[in-house]
């Protein structure tokens, strides 16, 4: 793992907001991805209730809707979501209305809540808290049983970010991280990430690893 040092915090936040605005309509996560995560979670989670669930770096929020519907939602609605998904600048829906039912609230986080964190103020909605994912609300400590992000490479300081994610994770939580082995840049300061780097940062036990097409990876870590 290599880190491009960005010492100015204000500059870092402004850069990440601009990046989010440019890619706001892009959602890397698909219905199939979250369906696979759902199977993994149900196989390994330690508690009667799976949630609450937290998605980090959510941009337009579609991944929040996918996690909520697939894990906690109506099977009929899920069938419609799957049918109307198209691959267009990532994954999107021809009829996003079907994905918007029963969104959670950041002001009332329950066992079946699915919440997002996004640095871009344009993403504000009832289930999305606007902040950096390495500076989250103090009262979220030990809150979330499932944490998902494909944005770890956007961290300014990977050790600080990992500690913050561990702080808000419930004991025994599953943290799912998508990452690629690309060089560090101004917008993705953490580059050349390897699975051993994440294991060292987060500890716990690796319960899942996938190598997609040789350049993109998903890893699931169950923390102690």
Model-predicted regions and their roles:
Residues 154-165:
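A short, conserved alpha-helix within the catalytic core of class I
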Residues 131-147:
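A short acidic, Gly/Pro-enriched loop at the edge of an enzyme's catalytic core
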Residues 182, 186-213:
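Conserved Class I S-adenosyl-L-methionine
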Residues 172-181:
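Conserved beta-strand signature within the Rossmann-like core of class I S-adenosyl-L-methionine
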Residues 1-48:
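Class I SAM-dependent methyltransferase Rossmann-like catalytic core
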Residues 52-135:
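Class I SAM-dependent methyltransferase SAM/SAH-binding core
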Residues 9, 213-220:
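Short hydrophobic/aromatic beta-strand or adjacent loop that forms the aromatic wall/cage
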